[in-house]
Amino acid sequence: EQEEQRQKNAHRLKAAAEREAIFIAEREAAERKRREEEKERQRREAEIRNLPTTLYACVSSWNSHINSTLKHKYFFNYYSYYTHKNDATSSMWDTWKTVWNFKNDPSKNISSYEHTTALNKVIDLVEGELRRTFGSKTEYLTLVCLTASTQRKTELRFKKFAEIVCKDLKMNNAYPYIRVAGEGGAMHEGGTGVTSKSYDSSFFKGKYIVLFDDVRTSGNSLERERRILENYGAKVICAITIAQTVRDY
């Protein structure tokens, strides 16, 4: 009986020691996790504090234009179709078709296949550029697509594009927070480029903005959008367009 009792005591002591060891290990693991989470929290806080500096630094090598401090990236030169349609190069035609098919204007009889092909091409270009430029910092950015001349055209042109890019890059999507109230016309097609729009101004406060449009001509539309958003408390970091109009002099 004494031997049996001794073994029971030994077993209890061993079990108690094992429970204590498990408790200590779990406590140490919890402490390590807490320290790691605190370290990550401090890193993110520092990263967020430095965003105004680091995000602008990311685009320091992008294009600058006369009379504008807005950094701009584009992928193709856009020549006037009406000037060059009879002597256009294959590159000009490729750019025209990419822009036209992306814009998906309901009056132009663009097929679903043509639009989807152009959409995927532009998404790949834009996402690739943003990843290379900002890395994981895309999560701090908000994508603002400049509106077309009507709400319907804006939806056909930008809604799906914005949804996909923002989902893939974990960006904020500003598309639902801007609506067209009046009509204008595209500048590179002879319009004024001015539309009447309504903004959910509270959404933009403190946001870091990437502007997007299909074609930049004079840059006035981008600058106008920049001023509006900055008046709402946003910081406009840069602009991306599919193409840049090349003037013939």
Question: For each predicted feature, which ranges?
Answer:
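A phosphate-binding catalytic loop at a beta-strand-loop-alpha-helix junction
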Residues: L211-E225
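Short acidic, S/G/P-rich loop/turn micro-motifs used as interaction or catalytic elements
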Residues: D105-P106, T150-R152
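Substrate-recognition/cap helix-loop segment adjacent to the acidic, metal-dependent catalytic center
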Residues: K153-N172
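Long, low-complexity, compositionally biased polyampholytic IDRs enriched for Lys/Glu and Gln/Arg
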Residues: E1-A46
